[in-house]
Amino acid sequence: MKKLFECIPENYFNLFAGKNRGFYAEVAFLLYEQFHINRAGILYSLMKDEVQELIETKEELGECIDIEDEIEEKEQDSAGRANEVLRRLKKLKWIDVEVRDQFEEFIVLPVYSSRILAVLKEICENRTIEYQRYCFTTYQLLTGVEAEERPASAILESEKYSEQLYDELTILLHNMKNHMETIAAKDDIQQVLEHHFGEYKKDIIDKSYHRLRTSDHVSRYRNKILERIQTWFLDDKFMKRAAEDAVESGYSANWEEAMDGLSKKMYRVEEIYSNLDEICNQIDARHYQYLRAVLDRSRYLSTYNDSINYKISYILEHIGQMDENILDSSLFRLVQLRQLQEASLLSPRKKKGVYEPEQHEVNEISDEMREELKAENIRRMEKVMNRKKIQKFVLEAMKGRQEIEMSELNLQNEDDALYLIYVYLYGYSKGTGYKLSEEPPEFITQKGYTFSNRTIKREN
């Protein structure tokens, strides 16, 4: 890997070092916009007119562009200053100038300038992130025709898109933290609410978080991607073919280097998609931390704004901004003193007396009532269904036989029909004295009840 200033000029970023850095940033974005319109080269005179128009617009708005302080020769008109701006861009190696047919000059962006401007423009635009696009593209690369015809390219590209997905999720996590710090610095509850329902909702909720956790969920293709990567790891023929493709395509110098590089890329893809739940959970936790921070800050500011300390500090702050003559002519008493009244004093605490419970009266129960309650309990116990009662019912119906069908059970009334449910319930457990057969039964109707006519066998 090369060093940074082996790839770009050493004084490249001096363009943004002066007091006109905001103006030069606009010129750079204007240059990048024209680069997209004229890919083969920007006509020098056209770019000069664009810069001249920008300078004149700034001056009409009352902004001062002191380009003369940064150049050796002073230019008075806007056309001359536009020329100096382009000459400075050329001197700092932001642009190259080519002379073509009929001595026309064209501006060409070096590779590093076009890439740096693309990154800067992306930062300023704060675009909506399509997280699922990275997953879908990775899935297509690993399962499409590219994986069969150019496996090395498919692996390298899938690792690149996986890294971009992970970077975007990490950026979202850090952006939430920045919004938390912004909320903590707000001094007014109105500012807190405006930031939450304005910037946070627009930049985080609408553009990233809501899509991430609903329609754009990143876990949709995760299992298929992991399955394909793990299958390739176990396929020696595919790995050899991918290594040969990497050597033939120039990605690697030899077969061993290709195998090592492709394995690392595949491990990285597997690691990213295996840890997706973890980073998504961190994003959820950070979002809830932000919401708690908004609530706590709003609650604190609403309480503080109603306090005496805030009101006094607010009055003193405005007094400090007033004219001294007004203060001299309109003095007022800050504290009003009144006679002490007994009602304003805190009442002394009274000692709590000893608790004295009410006397409990014991009512005697007659023998007749005791016998009646006892008989009621016996009747209630007789109605309770239990294992022994069901076992007795079934064995009495079998009358010494080894097996019978459930239709042979003696069903006399509705209470007996309830026994069928418990015969099923205990028929497949141990210790009941009987068991039900496993064969598919026939359904029959007997005395108005439909049930499966299973065979009951005596348990040895």
Swiss-Prot record:
Protein name: Wadjet protein JetA
Gene from which the chain derives: jetA
Disruption phenotype: When this gene is missing the Wadjet system does not confer plasmid-transformation resistance in B.subtilis.
SUPFAM superfamilies referenced in this protein's UniProt entry, alphabetically: Glyceraldehyde-3-phosphate dehydrogenase-like, C-terminal domain
Function: Component of antiplasmid transformation system Wadjet type I, composed of JetA, JetB, JetC and JetD. Expression of Wadjet type I in B.subtilis (strain BEST7003) reduces the transformation efficiency of plasmid pHCMC05.
Pfam families, sorted: JetA
Superkingdom of the source species: Bacteria
InterPro entries for the chain: JetA
Coiled coil: none
